[in-house]
Amino acid sequence: MEVKTLANIKSAIKRAELNVKQNEKNSAQKSAMRTAIKAFEANPSEELYRAASSSIDKAASKGLIHTNKASRDKARLATKLG
């Protein structure tokens, strides 16, 4: 995999390649979280709430979103659940 970078040092080139891979993985995880939230908002149910809550927790544990944002998002979903 070739990454276009200005780096000349071998370790910097490797880090640039890793950054691209990590960005793709993180973007996919965040997208899955957003999709789960949107699915719940479209049709609020206990099952979809659990799925959305789980995906929010996973994103927070991996450092994709702040812990406080995760708590806030889950609380907002819980109020929509009723």
UniProtKB/Swiss-Prot annotation:
Q: Which family does it belong to?
A: Belongs to the bacterial ribosomal protein bS20 family.
Presence of the UniProt keyword RNA-binding in the record: yes
Q: What does this protein do?
A: Binds directly to 16S ribosomal RNA.
- Identify the taxonomic lineage of the organism of origin: Bacteria, Bacillati, Bacillota, Bacilli, Lactobacillales
The record's annotation in NCBIfam families points to: S20
Task: Supply one GO molecular-function term.
Answer: structural constituent of ribosome
Q: Name one GO biological process term.
A: translation
- Residues in coiled coil: none
* Record's protein name: Small ribosomal subunit protein bS20
Q: Which UniProt keywords apply?
A: Ribonucleoprotein, Ribosomal protein, RNA-binding, rRNA-binding
Q: Which organism is it from?
A: Streptococcus agalactiae serotype V (strain ATCC BAA-611 / 2603 V/R)
Out of the domains of life, which is the source?
A: Bacteria
Task: State any GO CC term.
Answer: cytosol
User: What HAMAP family does its record include?
Assistant: Ribosomal_bS20
Signal peptide: which range, if any? Answer: none
